[in-house]
Structure formats: structure tokens, C-alpha cells
């Protein structure tokens, strides 16, 4: 099926959001996903089906240290 992920067209055989996250090699605890302009809670990913033409925005969380101001 054809999906749009972060504005880029991609083909995928994943049938659910959970399978897509696994297929893309993402760490589930480090991303948030919006499917067709709706944020999908992480616990719903395994049973959230994907359909041809779906649009996803995937945000990666990156940890960092704190810097002291000069």
C-alpha cells in the first residue's frame, strides 16, 4: 500500500501501525505518531489498521543533556 510518512510517499506492506513501527526499526518509546491528523496512543498501535493513502507524521524524541548558561 502507499503511505505518506512525514510528507514523503512510501510503499509498505505493514497492516497495522505497530507493524509499521517495527518494520521501520523505530523504538516505540521514543516516537509519537499522528495518523490522518489524529494522534494515536501507543497502546493502540498494534490494533490500528493502515490503509492505502494514509498520511502519517512520526516525531522522534531525542534526549539531551543540559548546558549551563555562560
Label the model's feature ranges:
Residues 1-70:
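Ubiquitin-like/PB1-type beta-grasp interaction modules and other compact soluble beta-rich domains
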Amino acid at each position: 500500500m502507499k503511505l505518506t510518512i512525514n510528507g514523503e510517499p512510501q510503499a509498505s506492506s505493514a497492516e497495522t501501525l505497530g507493524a509499521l513501527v517495527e518494520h521501520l526499526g523505530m523504538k516505540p518509546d521514543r516516537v509519537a505518531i499522528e495518523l490522518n491528523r489524529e494522534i494515536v496512543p501507543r497502546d493502540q498501535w498494534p490494533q490500528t489498521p493502515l490503509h492505502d493513502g494514509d498520511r502519517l507524521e512520526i516525531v522522534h524524541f531525542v534526549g539531551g543533556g543540559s548546558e549551563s548558561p555562560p
